[in-house]
UniProtKB/Swiss-Prot annotation:
Keywords: Cytoplasm, Fatty acid biosynthesis, Fatty acid metabolism, Isomerase, Lipid biosynthesis, Lipid metabolism, Lyase
Species: Haemophilus influenzae (strain ATCC 51907 / DSM 11121 / KW20 / Rd)
Gene Ontology biological-process entries: unsaturated fatty acid biosynthetic process
The organism's taxonomic lineage, starting at the top: Bacteria, Pseudomonadati, Pseudomonadota, Gammaproteobacteria, Pasteurellales
Active site: H76
Principal cellular location given in the protein's record: cytoplasm
Name of the protein in question: 3-hydroxydecanoyl-[acyl-carrier-protein] dehydratase
EC number per UniProt: 4.2.1.59, 5.3.3.14
Amino acid sequence: MQNACTLNKKSSYSYDDLLASGRGELFGKEGPQLPAPTMLMMDRIIEMNEETGAFGKGYIEAELDIKPELPFFGCHFIGDPVMPGCLGLDAMWQLVGFYLGWIGGKGKGRALGVGEVKFTGQILPTAKKVVYRIHMKRVINRKLVMGMADGEVEVDGRVIYTATDLKVGLFQDTSTF
């Protein structure tokens, strides 16, 4: 992986930084990219490091401001708006992939799986803020760069989703994936 100094690693990232990642400008054209809006599931990353988290192998915390006009509320479900749970899960995968780029990994990010996901609440258009927390468990840096983490999604101070063994890989060639 690249030297951290060449990446200009920061411990937090603005919305504009996240958009730059989606354009391939943050980690370079060979690094992983976040999706662009409307699939980008966070507004900012407020903390990133390689030392803390539940396993002492890295931690990421990001936030999404909830606004009633977010696109999914208009169609999921009509008259009963709720953020699809799969979008919270995807946000956690997005953050694991971002972490792999942040530490210098190269390739296109792809979600590879999750051990277990539990949903114990929901995100409604009346909510104010979603917080994602990712606890890195392991990073493999061989032919395939892969990260494994546990994560949680909190809305307005209450944890509502948990996921174990989130897996994301970085691939040089995705044509046969």
